[in-house]
């Protein structure tokens, strides 16, 4: 090879490396938020009831059917604290199995609830996805107050035999409407 060709090859290699280096310094692409609307109807089985002074703590196992952006079932645990002034705070968390915006897998869905005389406030968070839901993140709130169905099996939105697998008669049951946004990390 002659000197002009070597210099030309080195120059091309240098420019190629410079372009690759510049591309690596660009910020990561951000996932675009996707609106999420869905509802759930659950079946709750009381595991324990404790009284600590004037406060009552109820722990329940929950199974729920989801319809909308989230389509599938959730199995988890809920802990509700009933305060002497009549307000209720609660936390629930479980594993959701199904599809989210058409993608299949599992993820963890967590809720934090506050029930006061002024109504319900619920915040939900979803993450820790597997399968096609790997990289899923989301959050939002509920729309309006939960609809309580009471003991037995809810009349609509939930089938005690098929969705989720047989759970027997519920100690309590609720239907909740959710809104928020999700994204899938690139």
Name these PLM-found stretches.
Residues 32-186:
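Beta-strand-enriched cores of mature, soluble protein domains
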Residues 26-31:
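Sec/Tat signal peptide C-region and signal peptidase I cleavage site
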Residues 3-15:
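Bacterial N-terminal signal peptides that target proteins for export
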């Amino acid at each position: 090879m002659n000197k002009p060709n070597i210099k030309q090859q080195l120059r091309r290699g240098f420019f190629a490396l410079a372009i690759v280096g510049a591309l690596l310094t660009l910020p990561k692409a951000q996932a675009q938020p996707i609106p999420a609307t869905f509802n759930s109807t659950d079946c709750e089985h009381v595991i324990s009831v404790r009284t600590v002074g004037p406060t009552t703590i109820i722990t329940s196992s929950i199974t729920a059917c989801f319809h909308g952006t989230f389509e599938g079932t959730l199995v988890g645990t809920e802990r509700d604290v009933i305060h002497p002034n009549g307000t209720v705070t609660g936390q629930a968390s479980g594993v959701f199995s199904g599809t989210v915006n058409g993608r299949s897998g599992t993820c963890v869905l967590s809720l934090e609830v506050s029930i006061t005389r002024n109504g319900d406030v619920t915040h939900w968070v979803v993450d820790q996805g597997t399968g096609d839901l790997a990289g899923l993140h989301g959050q939002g709130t509920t729309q309006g107050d939960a609809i309580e169905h009471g003991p037995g099996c809810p009349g609509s939105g939930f089938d005690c035999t098929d969705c989720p697998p047989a759970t027997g008669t519920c100690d309590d049951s609720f239907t909740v409407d959710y809104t928020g946004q999700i994204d899938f990390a690139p």
